[in-house]
């Protein structure tokens, strides 16, 4: 893998992982347009570590407060808004973790295609538009509730289908529950921490069991690029979200879906 490929793919991962526009829809473009081959387990792992580090550092105070409060709740010190949020994040992770563990091979066998990505990019983009247009926007992430967290968690299962966008579908679900745009986005980003961590652990296990040779030097460049681009993306997205809403991302998804259909029809 050339340094150009590493830079481009790391930028795509970092810039699209937390925006509601589907990272898989963008990662398919280099292979379709430039003929780039699959980057391999080690590269997937290193990019996940980069984006995981970004969200952990950006939300470090929230993570510290939730962790302390969660441990306190286990010790019988009572509930706080941080301990409740921590429990909701954990509960919301279970559906995708279970279904992903048992159904990942089925998804990769039957749903990992360019046309599936084009369809899901378009359809779930329209669903995001509908949810944003009809959202009450009266709750923060601390008012999600257990039922709401589970609803968002089951919505996250749909992100196993390539092109759906994990952040997109979970923000959509949050808006449906009446969360503010910022609250839905923050809950989505916080719940990405355990799911990305588990995906990284899974990739690490597969890598350990494989005999893949890796030149780690260039890959750490990819980790750094995905980290910096992801943390900047989170920051700018949360600042602009209430100003611009979801419509720019919806329009972008529709254009991207149409473009994917176009290039796939020519292959």
From Swiss-Prot:
Q: Which InterPro entries match?
A: UppP
The species is Psychromonas ingrahamii (strain DSM 17664 / CCUG 51855 / 37)
The function of this protein is: Catalyzes the dephosphorylation of undecaprenyl diphosphate (UPP). Confers resistance to bacitracin.
Report the membrane topology from the UniProt record.
Multi-pass membrane protein
The EC number on file is 3.6.1.27
| Cellular compartment(s) | Cell inner membrane
Instruction: Please state which protein family the record places this protein in.
Output: Belongs to the UppP family.
Instruction: Return one Gene Ontology term, BP aspect.
Output: peptidoglycan biosynthetic process
Transmembrane intervals: 1-21, 39-59, 87-107, 113-133, 144-164, 189-209, 219-239, 244-264
Misc remark:
Bacitracin is thought to be involved in the inhibition of peptidoglycan synthesis by sequestering undecaprenyl diphosphate, thereby reducing the pool of lipid carrier available.
**Name of this protein:** Undecaprenyl-diphosphatase
Q: Which UniProt keywords apply?
A: Antibiotic resistance, Cell inner membrane, Cell membrane, Cell shape, Cell wall biogenesis/degradation, Hydrolase, Membrane, Peptidoglycan synthesis, Transmembrane, Transmembrane helix
Pfam families, per database record: BacA
Keyword Hydrolase in annotation = yes
